[in-house]
Design a protein with these regions (language model features):
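Alpha-helical transmembrane segments of multi-pass membrane transport proteins
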Residues: 1-275
Length: 275
């Protein structure tokens, strides 16, 4: 959610929305999501009486900052370049790759010629996956248009909502929370954006606001029990059972659902940074 976010780029390309504005729209919701997780962690920590680690010394903090400096500089370069109109979001991707290679080879010295080969292979594999998803989604959109199903769905949604943006967002949130458990964000955006965006325009909803709600929603869906994709990733890392993590995730899920409701029904949280 916090820029630079690939999901905002995907949504922007589908809905023909400004990616720069979408990046700005994601700042406050992203910070709210982070704050929600912090509050949940503090509550759980006090309830379980977890031990507090000793504070890091000034020397340790300075060392950690120096080690992380070049990595922290990347989002500054990307966002600064985009917001400063130095380069487009597409060009920012190329700049970030070049910067990452330079830092990895000459600063951290963790990238060798052999690793570059592996990186290129992994990049090709990832790109191919995304292209197949894009191809399928484009075909899906084409079939919707040719069969005029998009107009039928739009008419159905307008009848169900009765012209109410509140009811529309209730439907959007329920559908995406369920879809987010089973689908990755890119696939879900390609499937549902063409369905929801026209209805949102009919209801006078800002496409930037809709995109922010959809992406926050899908982020929550990724760790919503019982089948949230990120739950299984966390199980593999922590070497625990899905039942254990499902119980532990509840406070975080509640906090993020509260944030989702705030972002959904207070459009200013998404649009206040857009001049």
């Amino acid at each position: 959610v916090i820029p630079p976010s690939i999901t905002f780029v995907v949504y922007g390309s589908i809905a023909d929305a400004s990616i720069t504005d979408l990046f700005k729209a994601g700042v406050i919701p992203g910070l709210l999501m982070g704050a929600g997780l912090i509050v949940a962690a503090l509550v759980v920590g006090r309830k379980m009486d977890l031990k507090v680690l000793p504070k890091a010394t000034g020397k340790e903090r300075w060392k950690a900052f120096k080690d992380a400096f070049w990595g922290l500089l990347m989002p500054v370069i990307i966002l600064g370049g985009i917001y400063g109109s130095i380069f487009t979001p597409t060009e920012a991707a190329a700049v970030s790759v070049f910067y990452g290679l330079i830092v990895g080879i000459f600063v951290y010295r963790e990238i060798s010629l052999k690793k570059i080969k592996d990186i290129l292979i992994d990049s090709c594999s990832t790109t191919a996956t995304v292209m197949f998803i894009t191809m399928g989604a484009t075909l899906f959109g084409y079939v919707l248009t040719r069969a005029r199903l998009d107009l039928a769905i739009e008419g159905f949604m307008m009848n169900v909502t009765g012209g109410s943006s509140i009811i529309f967002f209730i439907i959007v949130n329920i559908v995406l929370l369920i879809a987010g458990c089973f689908l990755d964000s890119t696939s879900a955006l390609y499937i549902f954006t063409p369905l929801f965006a026209p209805v949102a325009l009919q209801l006078g909803i800002d496409p930037i606001h809709l995109g922010t709600v959809m992406i926050v929603n899908l982020a929550v869906g990724l760790f919503t029990p019982p089948v949230g994709v990120n739950l299984y990733v966390a199980c593999g890392i922590g070497k625990i059972k899905i039942e254990e993590i499902t119980k532990g995730i509840v406070p975080c899920l509640v906090a993020e659902l509260v944030v989702l409701l705030l972002v959904t029904y207070i459009p200013a949280l998404s649009t206040m940074l857009i001049g």
